[in-house]
Amino acid sequence: MKVCIAEKPSVAKEIADIVGAKNRHDGYYEGNGYQVTWTFGHLCTLKEPHEYTDSWKQWTLRSLPMIPTRFGIKLISDRGIEKQFGIIESLMSNAEVVINCGDAGQEGELIQRWVMQKAACKCPVYRLWISSLTEEAIREGFQNLKPQTEFDSLYFAGLSRAIGDWLLGMNATRLYTLKYGQNRQVLSIGRVQTPTLALIVNRQLEIEHFVPQPYWELKTLYRETTFAVTKGK
């Protein structure tokens, strides 16, 4: 049996229609030698600090920086995710071939790879790489499947991004919370959220400190018609 794993249910439905997997089951489609299942975006994430060592349970400055010797992944704690992962894991355990049908990009590669790692997938894996869900694009994609190993660099790029976010977020959040949280609140720091917050704060400060300045507009009168500059308003 060939097991296809899409990144979302709607994509799985499109793929199932093309490959002939017409029978709907709980969490997957089946038919014509295929089983088509799906994730809901991220099913797995990097482990929390305390899951690496008990010494990182307490938030202390002396424990920083926290740098795991080897990063590990875990299933996100959610009943729906746990159920769907169980279905995926069961399908993979009996698969002859797995086809990674994740979104064509760095994050799509990371999402599916983590699921396959967590499910201990041992059979050959191929990659469906498409940027459109038209029937023609899907059929062409299945005719040009490539070994997943050809996309290892894309996976490692996504993994590096995730690890970088973890190192910054976990360490900086604890640092700023301990130094400036005054034992009342967690000061969350992140690669994207903190610069975005800074943009908002800076803009608000500009508004609060705005001082009106006199300005002039250029106008001219020609044959009883007034012309004015509007560009840049």
What are these regions (language model features)?
Residues 6, 161, 165-232:
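Prokaryote-biased recognition of long, low-complexity C-terminal linker/tail segments
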Residues 1-166, 170, 176, 232:
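Intrinsically disordered, low-complexity regulatory segments
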